[in-house]
Amino acid sequence: MLSTPPKLPSAHGPVHFPRRSGTGMNRMARSATAVKTLAGLSFKRERAVLKSGMAPVAGADEAGRGPLAGPVVAAAVILDPKRIPAGLDDSKKLTATRREALFDEICATAEVSVVMAPPSRIDRDNIRQATLWALANAVKGLPEDPRLVFVDGNDRPPLECEVEMVIGGDGLIASIAAASIVAKVTRDRLMVGLGAAFPGYGFERHMGYGTAEHGAALRRLGPCRHHRTSFAPVRAQQLVLFETEMLEIEAEPLVDALV
């Protein structure tokens, strides 16, 4: 694990992870031959974009659509074609140790922007709209405006630049893979922090997903302010707690009469 955790993203604006070394992206060579071929990933589309002179090109992805608690985190990355970290892949296919190492390397060599949509926005807008908002603002927060953005999935975020949706893109496109790693590591670290701040839920283990442990904690403790109350399992526990409280209130006069 990295010795220094990243600054956590704000719901109000992007967080940048500036490269610690190397020349600016505007000055780097855009040659397609500068792109490395890494095992497990295809760079045909990125090569074509770079060869056409359509640069910079970015990748965007999110982490945390499905959990019952915590934010959805979106990341956008512009990779340096000459310094692509070796071994990039879908973050879900990597070990935690490998993700952490790649996170450090990506932040040191690429332009990175991260935005989170907190549970309050998810509950207000719905998870789809909150995710699209986070993805769009992560891209807008990059130091350079990309000419083209590769985005994982098939749901296009509202962006003025050209967007290419790629289903399974985090296992196909290097910049999407990098974004998926940044988003997941950032979110996992945040959930570990929430686990310490809200003991008993086990956030540091299940990262907010609907595991058996999490379900038991919800039944025992009820939801906290980091739960997504618009999600059915959380809403159901809220209803149970409300009904229990109402029964207790109704029973109070009877208890007083018996005392």
UniProtKB/Swiss-Prot annotation:
One GO CC term on file: cytoplasm
Enzyme class: hydrolase
GO biological process, one term: mismatch repair
Keywords: Cytoplasm, Endonuclease, Hydrolase, Manganese, Metal-binding, Nuclease
Domain RNase H type-2: 55-243
Catalysed reaction, written as an equation: Endonucleolytic cleavage to 5'-phosphomonoester
Enzyme Commission code: 3.1.26.4
Keyword Transport: no
PROSITE patterns: RNASE_H_2
Source domain of life: Bacteria
Keyword Manganese: yes
Subcellular location: Cytoplasm
Residue segments, region Disordered: 1-26
Similarity comment text for this entry: Belongs to the RNase HII family.
Protein name (database record): Ribonuclease HII
Organism the protein comes from: Azorhizobium caulinodans (strain ATCC 43989 / DSM 5975 / JCM 20966 / LMG 6465 / NBRC 14845 / NCIMB 13405 / ORS 571)
Gene: rnhB
